Amino acid sequence: MKRRASITAKHRPAGKRKRPARTTRGISTAEWQARIELAAAYRLTAMMGWSDMLGTHISCRVPGTDDQFLINPYGLLFEEMTASALIKCDTGGRKLSVSPYEVNEAGFTIHSAIHMSRHNAAAVMHCHTQYGVAVATQKQGLLPVTQMALTALNLVRYHDFEGVAHDHDERERLVRDLGNGGMLILRNHGTLTVGATVGEMFARMYRLERACKFQITAMTGGAELNRIPDEIVRHTLTQGQEIYSQGGRGAGGSLMWAALLRKLDRESPGYAR
């Protein structure tokens, strides 16, 4: 069945989005909602200053499938992204939606690897942020020197640089190194987060990027860093797990995500088309 490449949808406020009256054949209500959430993540990434022209990517699994995901068309800026512009593809590399654009090859390698192997990773985000890349180049990686870092470190894993991610055999090593983590520092390259929802994925990237920014800024000052005692490090790591686990007040980033959607509705409302 052929799928048209565009959708007409009237934008609605956050939390009240409905399936548009005219919709692309073959797109379910659940997929359309996923498209809106993912397009929002792209717009917010641009708004945060985390985009790298056309060089990075965010994806989410198509609801109800194990082998299909949505990702950006290679050629659109993040600030231009809309729900209908996103490309649906499968983990075998086939485009399942009509688009004049292709998928970034490195994006396919990275995102297909995680969507194939981590069924609880519905959303995946990869960035080349200023501070994330800076920490990724440092041998010691993310240090336990701030509260933000300590509430994230339980989720952080590392993957060694292998060149531009065009080789599909790197997928196995990416998956191995991510393990059960939620944040991956790609050494000499960038950062990656996964989440059960787009909101959780985005909230994790926010925490990781802030922790990296604080570390680089503190080191730039040249003064000796204040070492946190080991027992306080352990205590704060436990607190971070409790706060961001299911049932914790920061679980899933749901409150942050709802607030960010309201901000996006005010400042860049075209994403839900």
Please annotate each region the language model reported:
Residues 2-273:
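Glycine-rich flexible loops
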